[in-house]
Amino acid sequence: ADQPFTRVDCGTCTRCIDACPTEAIVADREVDSRLCISYLTIELKGSIPRNLRPKMGNWIFGCDICQEVCPWNGKAPLSMEKGFAAEDSARTPDLGKLMELNQSEFRKRFKNSPVLRTKRRGLLRNVAIALGNWGNPQAIPALELGLIDQEPLIRSHSAWGLGQVATKKAYDILENALTSEEDPQVLEEIREALSAFKEKTDPIL
């Protein structure tokens, strides 16, 4: 087993602590995994807490902010190993297209990829949050598709995403979903999303 790493080279630097969107780095070299975007998007299998969703931005699988801001990492040479290189399609994936993936398409698209760890429902849950954080009406078709997915986890987070878009069309989609949805958690998310419209200072209704 590896020996515990005890050497401290951080000095007075707090860049990683300051940059973390969810304030997951709670003390010197201590991370609260329950707040870490990498944990939330990969390891957490259930619903992501609502208060953390806006802080996740467009991260859909992991997060490297703390690594990117670390001065020491800036001195590390780039790896020439091809296996570590990301495909162009993985750098800026089309979130709408990801929401269209069925189970077999998901497994084919991410074959031999660590993305399989989060499973389809986990990835599309994350995509729904990213689309909601985008807040653009162009996200509505993908979120509407997510709202009728067979997985309650995807439906519930798609409802939240529609609440963030806050247009009349999004509102109508959520209201219509109330008449057909039966899952208690999804219904709760739909009602919360509808109430979010009323809290906005200038909802587009």
Report residues per predicted region.
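Glycine-rich adenosyl-nucleotide cofactor-binding module
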Residues: A1-D18
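Short, charged low-complexity linear segments at domain edges
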Residues: A1-F5, S33-L52, Q103-R107
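Iron-sulfur cluster-binding cysteine motifs and their immediate structural context
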Residues: R15-Y39, W59-G83, A142
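C-terminal amphipathic alpha-helical segment
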Residues: L52-F84, L101, E105-L116, G122-I129
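Conserved nucleotide- and phosphate/pyrophosphate-binding catalytic cores
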Residues: F84-G96, L116, I129, Q138
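Amphipathic alpha-helical scaffolding segments comprising HEAT/armadillo-like alpha-solenoid repeats
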Residues: E105-R109, N136-I148, T167-T179, T201-L205
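Short inter-helical turns and helix N-cap capping residues of alpha-solenoid HEAT/ARM repeat scaffolds
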Residues: R120, Q150-P152, E182-D183
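Structural detector for internal amphipathic alpha-helices that build alpha-solenoid repeat scaffolds
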Residues: L124-G135, L145, R155-T167, L187-K200
